Curated annotation (Swiss-Prot):
Source organism per UniProt: Eremothecium gossypii (strain ATCC 10895 / CBS 109.51 / FGSC 9923 / NRRL Y-1056) (Yeast)
Keywords: ATP synthesis, CF(1), Hydrogen ion transport, Ion transport, Membrane, Mitochondrion, Mitochondrion inner membrane, Transit peptide, Transport
CDD domains, per the entry: F1-ATPase_delta (cd12152)
Keyword Transit peptide (UniProt): yes
Record-level GO cellular component terms: mitochondrial inner membrane; proton-transporting ATP synthase complex
Taxon lineage: Eukaryota, Fungi, Dikarya, Ascomycota, Saccharomycotina
Name of the protein described by the UniProt record: ATP synthase subunit delta, mitochondrial
Length: 158
């Protein structure tokens, strides 16, 4: 009797363990979470592809991408939803791809690319370049950061 009960319990445990080893179906869409401190731009939205400006260059993320963590640099994040493309300029941040085809982007700032004026960017860049040679080290450091961001924005607007 004891052997029969033990055998049944062992069979149930083995059966549960066997069920857990089946692979899940691959995701057919990339789920995008794009968050800023004051706003969420995308929350679990199914997208086709996202192109990111990262420290090592530009990368494109599709569904089933290998899990990664990347540092974003100033540049354009392009979100492709079907035939529509949305472009956002980010000053930096982080992107994380999860094994379940979820891409999470966090950034301090992100603005639609079409909300910028090329003339204003040129004027701000000229002012930042003047401040880069300032005697005050804090002003010079802030100006160098502004130059990096504004040059990336100017290149994106071309």
């Amino acid at each position: 009797m004891f052997r029969l009960t033990s055998a049944r319990a062992l069979f149930r445990v083995a059966n549960v363990a066997a069920r857990r080893t089946y692979a899940e179906a691959a995701a057919d869409a990339l789920k995008l979470n794009f968050a800023l401190p004051h706003e969420t731009l995308f929350a679990g939205t199914a997208v086709k592809q996202v192109n990111l400006p990262v420290k090592t260059g530009q990368i494109g993320i599709l569904a089933n991408h290998v899990p990664i963590v990347e540092q974003l640099v100033p540049g354009v994040v392009e979100v492709l939803e079907g035939s529509e493309s949305k472009k956002f300029f980010v000053s930096g941040g982080f992107a994380t791809v999860q094994p379940d085809s979820t891409l999470s982007i966090t950034s301090v700032e992100a603005f639609p690319l079409d909300s910028f004026s090329a003339e204003n960017v040129r004027a701000l860049l000229a002012e930042a370049q003047k401040n880069a040679g300032a005697a005050d080290s804090r002003v010079a450091a802030e100006a160098s950061i502004q130059i990096e961001v504004l040059e990336a924005l100017q290149a994106a607007l071309k």
